[in-house]
Amino acid sequence: MIQSSPFPQPFSSPLAQPFGITPIQQPKPQQPREETMPRFVNYLADYSGCGHWRILWPEQVINMTQRGLSQSITAMIAEPRWYQGVKAVKLQRQASKAQLEFVKHLKKIQQEHDFKIIYEVDDVVFREEIPDYNKFKFAFDTDEVRESVVSIMDLCDEVTLTCDFMRKLFQSKLTNQKVTVIPNFVPYNWMGYLFNQKRVQTAFEKHKSKPRILYTGSGAHYDVANKTGGKDDMSAVNHIIRKTADKYKWVFVGAYPPPLQDLVKSGKLEFYPWRSLLEYPQFIANLDPQLMVAPLTQNNFNNSKSDIKFIEACTLGIPCLCQDMHTYSDAPDDLKFNTPEEFEEKIEWILNWKNRKRYFQNIRMLREIGVKRFLENPENIGSHMEALTTPYGSPERKYLKQWNP
């Protein structure tokens, strides 16, 4: 019998292995990496520019770099089990009474699953601060919406928005003082890859006899319904545009000032309807502008805006002449104006062919400003991650400190 054999049992020691090889130990099953990644849920208010800048683009980078699992939806889910394992729930610009009731329900679920609730907003939602010329004011112009939006924000653990002026304005309106700035960051794979220094220089030379000046913006910037007697974000400089229509080729994308309709019809001003978010960057680059402009009326609503126009221009290496206000506080002084007269003078100074050497030198400087605001930069996507995964005021927030000193 084998048991009584004087020889060792087969494979009872490493010395008796076939060919001297130890049997391979089967590894224990490993959890998929996704099982250990934080999960985030976003309730969107829109799938347009605001939704992409503030949630959908950051979500894409978070998912593609496996920093977490982020999911955006519009239908609000009341089932508590769905929130198991969720680290944060983000609410984008929710303002209705029904949405307030849902947030109250969400607070009850929060007690069981211990997730964070964040209110995300990129525009002022208080009706008393929205200019009458803004054609979208009606969406927030009732007592019910005003009360609901404040109540929702006060129920949240934190509010995130785009700039410091906006932060202070919201803190003056809310009981909830936990308000955090996360600027808008431009995705490299959306616009950043389009930079071409040689093209910018060649376009400047090509159009030196009649430089091209670009303004992009929706009808919300214009008094299209004549509610303010024509006073809007462009009214202060409309006469400069008319005056210089033969000297420069003014180009408008999205909408144009109603008082300048005759120049559009005659072809002196170029106008192009709004393009989809996917088409927009390439379309703007193909227009070959030598200068972009960003006039704004001084009010709390506009001071709370993000500097998107400036950052987009920098990303392409093109100068953008901005209104001298909080919105564009990071722009170089040479690219800011206060009065219509200064607007005209600085346009001449920037686009004068005699100053081409300085214009060419500034292309790279502007591009470097844009590069610092790429969404994919660790410190920028890191700001989004810190807001999602750490409590307000946490010492772990090293990236957010830059925007929230």
Name the predicted role of every residue range.
Residues 2, 11-98, 132, 402-404:
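N-terminal pre-catalytic "stem/leader" segment of glycosyltransferase-like enzymes
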Residues 108, 112, 139-159:
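Membrane-proximal helix-turn-helix segments that form the acceptor-binding/catalytic region
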Residues 157-171, 175-199, 216:
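Donor nucleotide-sugar binding/catalytic pocket of nucleotide-sugar-dependent glycosyltransferases
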Residues 198, 352-404:
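A charged, aromatic-enriched C-terminal amphipathic alpha-helix characteristic of glycosyltransferases
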